[in-house]
Amino acid sequence: MKHLKGLLLPALLALASSAAAKDPLVETTPFKNELVNLMYFDDSGVALVQELDNGKIFRSHDAGKGWKEIKDVQGLGIIKSPYDNKVALILGEKKHWITYDQGENWDSFETKLPPSPQGPVGWHAQDNKKILLNEIENCFTAPCLGKTYYTTDGFKTDPKTLVDDRRMCQWAKASERFLQGVDKHDDRILCITRGKYSDRSKDFRLLMSDNFFKETEEPVMSSGRTVQGMANMAAVKGYIVAAAKAEHSSELALYVTQDTDSWHHARFGDHKIEEDAYTILESTNYSIQVDVMTSKYVTMGNLYTSNSNGTYFTKNVEHTNRNDAGYVDFEKIANIQGVVLVNTVDNYKEVEKSGQSKKLKSRISFDDGRSFEKLTVKGKDGELHLHSVTNLHNSGRVFSSPAPGIVMGVGNTGDYLGKYTDGDLYVSDDAGLTWELALEEAHKYEFGDQGSVLVAVFDEGDTDEIRYSFKHGRKDTWQKIKLDYKIRARELTTLPDSTSLKFMIYGSRKKDGGGREHVIVHLDFSDMLKKCGDSDFDDEWSVRKDADGDPSCVMGHKQLFRRRKWDAECSVGELFKDPVPKFKPCDCDKFRDYECDFNFTPTGEGKDKKCEPSESFSLPKGACEGDAKSYKGSSGWRKIPGNQCKGETERDKQVERECKDAERPRPKTDKITSEITKFKGSNFMEQYYLERNTQSDGTDNDRGKDETVVMLTDERTAYITHDHGKKWKKAVDDEIVRIYPHQYENNNVYFLTASKKVYYSKDRGLHDSINSFEAPVMPNTEMLPIMQFHPKQKDWIIWLGGKNCEKLGNKDCHTVAYVSQKNGEDSSWESLVPYVKKCAFVWREAGRSVKEEQVFCEQHTNEEKNAPLELISSDDWFKKKDVKFKSVVEFATMSEFIIVATKAEDNTLHLDASLDAHTFAEAKFPPKFFDIHQTAYTVLDSSTHAVFLHVTVNPQRDQEYGSIIKSNSNGTSYVMSLAAVNRNTEGYVDFEKMQGLEGVAVANVIVNVDEVNKGAKKKKQSRITHNDGADWEPLQAPEKDSDDKPYDCDIADKKKCGLHIHGYTERADPREMYSSPTAVGLMLAVGNVGPELTTFGEANTFMTTDAGITWKEVKKGTYAWEFGDQGSVIVIVRRGEDTDHVYYSVDSGAKWDLYQFADHKMRVDAITTVPSDTSLNFLLWGKDSRELFAVNLDFSGLPEFQKECKLDENDPTKGDYDLWSPQHPLQQDEPECLFGHVAQYHRKKRDVKCRNGQRIDQMHDIARNCSCTRRDFECAYNYERDSSGDCVLVPGLSLPDPAKVCSNKNVKEYYSNTRFRKIPLSTCQGGTEYDKTGDVHPCPGFEEDFKKNHGVGGFTLFLAIVLPFAAAAGVGYWVWRNWDGKFGRIRLGEPGGGSAFDSDAPWVRWPIAAVSGLVAVGAALPLVVGSVWRWVVGRMGGRGGGGGGYSGLGGSGFGRAYTSRSSFARGRGEYSVVDPDEGELLGDEESDEDV
């Protein structure tokens, strides 16, 4: 294994001879600058080296004896082909060179950008002319994506573009053993690229192509589905491994293939694989070896080895030593099968608990890591310990070379490994079985001529000696070479195959006049040794011998080498010829050749070793069903992968096992099941879903199947369930006052006590994973957020506590913010700033290039408790701070924007926005509009590349209403969308976006505005838009009710007889949503048919399956609802009265069946399921008499869900799915054209019986773009819609000068003012372009260009992104995930005041946040700046988790006292933005925000 990182990318030298000179030849070549990239072309004496400072390249044709500069070439680096010893690349900034003759000749080619630093070249293992070249990635809008080029002629012609937006690419045949000898997939390339319609890392896809990405295929994994969130891939011997990461989880799913056609999900039993916490090691030809970190803060791991197809991994070595770079002290002895050297941490318990320094021990295995033994020194009792990969001091392998059985290392004897400089050089010539001291002090070392000569140079300082041995390095056989100067050796190297007698030392020596000079010393032993004869060889040297002196069996065979005898002073002289072993098979031995099978754990040692079923053991299919008392299963053993022993033993055979020793499977049922659990208490305070990593294929029998919920009652008892509420247990045995799920890491949850003690789990509470840490101070008692989390560094936590607050009323009590970079563990807290209201991490994945350490805080001026707030910033944990704003009311960060609300001297509120956390600009709004309406405004949504802003027109109590205005695509100009929209006293608005579909929204308007202005009661009607607010229409009432009776009004007249539904302002539980992001086109609502909306008590329940075009009444009365299995099942339960049953539908609401879950009626407050709506389990939450209860409803047993649905993206209607396209109800021509394109979504066929299972990507494709029509346009800035639907100038306004766009030097022409502008979401092309109906004119200076070319001009989105002021009014994209203050002070529905442990905690994440500006005396008028529906789905547990739709910058006292705390979840939903250009200012498919 070549350990190159951080070292000099070396390689090495050649040539040999035989003669008998007294001393070796020594030649010294000086260089002017420091050298890097010293490397050999394999099997030759040709070497290259590079000067670091100037990039000059030098070539030697005689193994480093002489060097010549390669003319006209200056590079950044040299990369040699690992598969062809004549090919290398020199990479420059934009000009590059390639050689096919070991550097004698170089041909140049160019790229537009410099090469990627992440791995610039992809080599084809079988065709040296096929090369991939990766350009540097664009990280400006993170995550980093770049362009890849390809050549099939070795860059004789210019390289061609492969893909523009890849994370990484490689050839399928990127390693020699992959598809070796198989004549297929020669041109196949695999790339991890951006998602179909998103460049967020959670949407990254793995694509394959056989024709250079003219056509692509997305491979299906073992689940039969494609997998998004691809993070990495690597070629390992005969395997390709790809890693996928689910959103809000650092846990990875590894997929393995041996042909790229079929992929398997790699299973690690009880252990999880996490991002940046695993290393794929130098694997064998028949298995993959992976070292997995066991702790985030302690660099230790466990070594796992796979079975032969790379699917099942078993643990071989525990507590392996690692370093921060991911390197592991693990090396296979070269050329000898089965011998492995590792270093393990002996005091692992102390290291994990208290952070003690690691005490390392070295161990060796002769059976590929299945068993280990100590390293012993001849004639000594003590153990030997050697420095390994984590402490590299030379290039190439650490211990060995292809020289058979010759191993060297620097270390010491004793209990543990000491410092490198306290070590000595040891040697073994029996592959590490026994060792002896070679030289005192630490030395660099190298092997030559198949071990005939060993060379060493002092490595603790300058030296004028070089040591060598012709007798296997045994003590007292080392000779000296005396130099005329002292050298500090930096690298000692020879040919990679160690067959040469020539060596090179690169180092530095003192220069006359001061300073140091860099030199390469060439050593040649060729003339010192005669050629060996037959008598000088041991023809059957073996790795180790048994007690009888016969070669012992390793991996099922005896491995025999022809090796020079240790005391024969002669040269093997087989230059460039690697030693080849002979193999003799052995009979299988049940102890030696077997290991524990998957899901079996080893106990005992040696012949007492047993393999017991592990906790995650599962019965074979069909076992122990009915009355069966036993079953046949694995013996617990398997033959070690790659073991070539002959015959069988008893361990190959299945054994009879008793069913009583195994957990019986739950009896299968074809019915719905329910389980009721009762709890003491009066109220459920909190419930959260800890949803599993959804990248798992769902077939795991250990991790991944759980559906974990944590819950807290008002008795301060926290409970946890891993099976969606069938079995509950106490989470911790202590009083808990709050639960904090980690906002960005689904596996992490925190249980807060009233003291400094915090319990936590980083594994969803599984496997006894709940631990505790001590917070620096008690939680604050000011209703401020206590914990904040970092979106990327999952263990970085901000803690907002109270100092001097132990006694009530202490005047010195104040808040202090602390930060931990170790998840609160190991006393890792550092103080940030005191007297703060809120702190938040600023870094986000997309669009903000700031340091990960950057933090914003609101701090009281001069650290005075009652002083106004300042917004301060720091990127060094407040060693220095920068004051951004004075008089701050609130701030929030979103994926692209940071929004700050400040109070001006006249008590008005101002908003400022920033893209980069450095430059802020004030949000500007239409002047005349705000001359009329100066009360309050609410940012409703910005998920469709435009901000929806509600401006209050009438602020009088119980008379509130206002207008919704909508921005253009950069958020800087607003037009009227809908007037007289209902608002409540708290500032929340009846407006809701439909989940999973673009541009569909529902709002309630006031139809008796004049009367309301005089104090009358509001009369409300519902409106719906299908083109993002450009047109609004009444909801079409169904023809008949659920009793098949007609309504008593004329439904043809929608304004007098429409469907009206209750909105956000009236919900008892505001987390309920009309829709689900995974049940595309489906909505449920409660309301009535008639001229206006009546009371809640008079309402019935309605449903639509076509995104609100048509509706039907499904039940009389008001019901709560939840979607399961992505809409396969819909469950509804009576709201507001006692009940003992639910109704459910498995055909999208066509038919409803009753299921009775209890033998008496109970009051149900809420129904919830997992945030992604992918489960077939639900929970009912409620109260029965004086007890709380939770009811699990499990629909998975129904016959309808016994098979998994089949989805083929290449032929989507062939299986169990249809393609469905939403339509516009008012569009006669091409009604399926919405926003200028036909979008196609997967929807399960109504009559098929199958379960969706793993979450599918709802959006299939954009089938085509459409011609532009009137529906693709809305009124332009300064225009508004009149009663006829036409766009007219706002009264009192004059038209702006259209020629102002010419101030942009890139604009060559402009259009006269028009009344229309294109809807930001629309992608229409051609047709009638209403925004260009004005005359076109040239800009000054471009008249000639104008005559030649009448191309369209105008504002480009790119400018909107790079000019900070353009973000000014991009106030939105508020999702609960999009707030920094996720847990508080951005008040999401709690009363003002109370303690941090109040039952209406501030981190109860309603997706609305009201900014109280204290604008008027005696009344706080809200600036509700926040919302969005993309979250709402993230919804705290099912659709009920998401809330009606706003996030707000939280001030005083807007909110409601909700008694129900049902269905908090931690996911968040997704709003599907289909415009492939994700660069707009208002957020991409989903933002990472916290509230």
Swiss-Prot record:
Pfam families: Sortilin-Vps10, Sortilin_C. It is a multi-pass membrane protein. Residues 1475-1491 have a biased composition (Acidic residues). Residues 1376-1405 are cytoplasmic. It is found in: Golgi apparatus, trans-Golgi network membrane; Prevacuolar compartment membrane. SMART domains: VPS10. It comes from the Eukaryota. This is Vacuolar protein sorting/targeting protein 10. It comes from Pyrenophora tritici-repentis (strain Pt-1C-BFP) (Wheat tan spot fungus). The gene is vps10.
